[in-house]
């Protein structure tokens, strides 16, 4: 599969159509705004962001990219949606936060800038591409030896169908209907296998759960629905 082929144009259009609402914390992107502090701290506590060159894969409108830049990282954000990237650039100008946003695939960038990033993040993106294993392999290629890599996605099981699709999209209406396809969700065992195939070492896995009564997210051991993984690219032998 070529870099351009590993793009689901219907998925790109889905987020293009909503791009103008990306930074509205009460919009369809409210969940992203609410989980951002958790995932930002998860990354920063393990990778020490200040001064690091960071790649945010599938950056969308720049919520995470901009947050990492505010922590002192030098961030490159990539996405295939031009509208979200335009929103991200405009918001960066308004907020005075510098992020290098580019319209490209991770596979293309890996060819041009191999082993050039200290940290790679790929959050809430893998379940939206035809070949997530290709994305992970390219993330590994673009990372420096010793780099930290972070991935987040949604588990594939009956509970995730109930919570992430029925609950989030139909009952609580936290997300637009059709945001996710259950068959594209990824089991932790599958993600871990792809990490191993890319010669990455899995360091940690954490679940992210939502309490609808308290309306808050927290990290824990429950990986039945949303989860994050931290991996490291091994140093080269001397």
Swiss-Prot record:
| UniProt: S-adenosyl-L-methionine binding residues | 39, 58, 79, 123
Query: What reaction does this catalyse?
Result: a 3-demethylubiquinol + S-adenosyl-L-methionine = a ubiquinol + S-adenosyl-L-homocysteine + H(+); a 3-(all-trans-polyprenyl)benzene-1,2-diol + S-adenosyl-L-methionine = a 2-methoxy-6-(all-trans-polyprenyl)phenol + S-adenosyl-L-homocysteine + H(+)
Which E.C. number(s) belong to this protein? 2.1.1.222, 2.1.1.64
Q: Which CDD domains would you find in this protein's record?
A: AdoMet_MTases (cd02440)
Q: What are the UniProt keywords, alphabetically?
A: Methyltransferase, S-adenosyl-L-methionine, Transferase, Ubiquinone biosynthesis
Biological process annotations from GO: methylation
Protein function: O-methyltransferase that catalyzes the 2 O-methylation steps in the ubiquinone biosynthetic pathway.
The record's section on NCBIfam families has:
UbiG
Please report the name of this protein according to its UniProt entry.
Ubiquinone biosynthesis O-methyltransferase
Q: Which organism is it from?
A: Hahella chejuensis (strain KCTC 2396)
Task: Name the gene.
Answer: ubiG
């Amino acid at each position: 599969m070529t870099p351009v082929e590993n793009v689901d144009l219907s998925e790109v259009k889905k987020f293009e159509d909503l791009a103008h609402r990306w930074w509205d914390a009460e919009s369809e992107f409210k969940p992203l705004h609410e989980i951002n502090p958790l995932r930002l701290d998860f990354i920063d506590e393990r990778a020490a962001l200040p001064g690091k060159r960071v790649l945010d894969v599938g950056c969308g409108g720049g919520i995470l990219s901009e947050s990492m830049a505010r922590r002192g990282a030098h961030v490159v954000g990539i996405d295939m949606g031009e509208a979200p990237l335009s929103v991200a650039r405009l918001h960066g100008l308004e907020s005075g936060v510098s992020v290098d946003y580019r319209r490209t695939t991770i596979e293309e960038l890996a060819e041009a800038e191999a082993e050039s990033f200290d940290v790679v993040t790929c959050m809430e993106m893998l379940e939206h591409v035809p070949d997530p294993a290709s994305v992970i392999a390219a993330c590994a290629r673009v990372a420096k030896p010793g780099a930290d890599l972070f991935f987040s996605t949604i588990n594939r099981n009956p509970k995730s169908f109930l919570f992430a699709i029925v609950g989030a999209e139909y009952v609580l209406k936290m997300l637009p209907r059709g945001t996710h396809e259950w068959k594209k969700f990824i089991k932790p065992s599958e993600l871990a296998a792809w990490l191993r195939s890319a010669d990455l070492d899995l360091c940690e896995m954490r679940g992210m759960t939502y309490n609808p009564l308290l309306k808050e997210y927290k990290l824990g051991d429950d990986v039945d629905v949303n989860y994050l993984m931290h991996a490291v690219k091994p140093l080269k032998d001397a």
